[in-house]
């Protein structure tokens, strides 16, 4: 193999060097049909309905996660605390590259519909099966069966069980670092700030007891005091991405409509042509073959939506036409102060009034995500080293607001048209 380079807007050049044997393996993995399929799966599902630039794919994100893992591994080399393991390093980079290879189309909507119709196989399970049984598995086994086994173990062990697994899956991992930078870039949002170069420079590796009262120890990444504000801003940006991008009310409307369409197809696959991959998939409930699953991508779903829009005259056809033309359900979000919750009694009364008036609606309560506090597994917290302190402190113990960022779930109701939404507003006003 000669040197290979991929131009990337986040990492500039992602390189595969002819001088590194495992880079040739990584390049072969990228060329497999299973990995190339990720070119046809959007990273953010329906976000481009609101943010037209957000058309990037899980393919580019997976390459970015691999590159981010490489950068994080250099921290281990520079600290010279942990004995280097080429096998572990290669497996870590490989796991970062392949972490999304089992993703289905349309982000998480497709998985929710699959589960509701009896296919209870999550994308993480498909990832493991692809690494085990596809061309990807063959390439890894032919190079080194130990790396194949080690790479697969990242998707089986408990998150954050050692430094290498922390790079692949944790609150500050290669996946999250890349998608936050990438999603901000392609959506164009400006809130918060992410400074991975500074955070990396402020990362230390310390051998710590599992909790302050335990004698058992593990190596962990620890943020130095100089990186405190940067890690706070990182979690602020993470929370805002969920609030303003991933859970945007308009893209959620499109998700709800797509979910209704796919649910109708799952219940009656006969409305699709004989060899439609989506029809074959839903007819193979509860356990589709791997080859059936990996035929699915966003292009298959949208071609099916086009077919339904043009070949039926029922509710599914109407929904499909509306989705194609961005004629979306209308949202009414119950008003409330930030970080507070809606009174459940009041919300229940509102829903009863809606039903009494014969109104059709969909409720949506997305859970805001932010910093997660671990009470029983202390080392999974983001730890900050404080000058003069012998043991680092968890981020939530130092920040006045980082734990509160994810509070205050939105309480939304979606209606088929503007008229119904306005009626709903009047009903809510009457009970306030």
Where are these predicted regions, by residue range?
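Histidine-centered, transition-metal-coordinating active-site segments
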Residues: 1-91, 101-432
């Amino acid at each position: 193999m000669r040197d290979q380079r991929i131009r990337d807007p986040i990492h500039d050049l992602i390189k595969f060097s002819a001088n590194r044997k495992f880079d040739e393996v990584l390049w072969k993995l990228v060329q497999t049909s299973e990995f190339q399929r990720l070119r046809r799966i959007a990273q953010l599902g329906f976000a481009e309905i609101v943010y037209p630039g957000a058309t990037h794919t899980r393919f580019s994100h997976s390459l970015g996660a691999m590159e981010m893992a490489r950068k994080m591994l250099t921290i281990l080399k520079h600290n010279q605390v942990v004995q280097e393991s080429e096998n572990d390093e290669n497996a870590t980079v490989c796991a970062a590259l392949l972490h999304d290879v089992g993703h289905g189309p349309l982000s998480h909507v497709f998985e929710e519909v699959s589960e509701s119709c009896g296919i209870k196989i999550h994308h993480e399970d498909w990832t493991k099966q692809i690494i085990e049984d596809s061309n990807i598995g063959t390439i890894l086994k032919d190079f080194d069966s130990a790396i194949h086994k080690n790479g697969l173990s990242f998707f089986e062990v408990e998150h954050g069980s050692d430094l290498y697994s922390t790079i692949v899956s944790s609150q500050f991992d290669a996946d999250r670092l890349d998608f936050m930078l990438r999603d901000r870039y392609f959506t164009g949002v400006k809130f918060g700030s992410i400074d991975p170069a500074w955070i990396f420079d402020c990362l230390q590796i310390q051998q710590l007891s599992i909790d302050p009262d335990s004698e058992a120890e593990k190596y962990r990444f620890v943020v130095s005091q100089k990186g405190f504000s940067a890690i706070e801003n990182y979690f602020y940006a993470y929370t805002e991405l969920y609030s303003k991008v991933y859970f945007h009310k308009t893209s959620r409307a499109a998700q709800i409509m797509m979910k209704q369409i796919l649910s109708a197809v799952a219940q009656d696959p006969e409305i699709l042509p004989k060899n439609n991959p989506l029809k074959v998939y839903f007819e193979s409930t509860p356990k589709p073959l791997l080859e059936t699953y990996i035929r699915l991508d966003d292009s298959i779903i949208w071609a099916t939506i086009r077919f339904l829009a043009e070949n039926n005259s029922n509710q599914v056809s109407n929904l499909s036409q509306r989705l194609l033309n961005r004629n979306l359900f209308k949202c009414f979000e119950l008003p409330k102060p930030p970080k507070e919750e809606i009174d459940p009694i009041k919300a229940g009364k509102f829903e009863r009034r809606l039903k009494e008036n014969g109104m059709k609606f969909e409720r949506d309560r997305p859970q805001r995500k932010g910093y997660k506090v671990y009470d029983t597994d202390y080392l999974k917290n983001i730890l900050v080293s404080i000058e003069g302190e012998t043991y680092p402190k968890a981020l939530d113990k130092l920040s006045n607001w980082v734990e509160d960022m994810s509070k205050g779930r939105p309480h939304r109701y979606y209606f088929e048209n503007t008229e119904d939404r306005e009626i709903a507003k009047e009903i809510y006003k009457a009970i306030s």
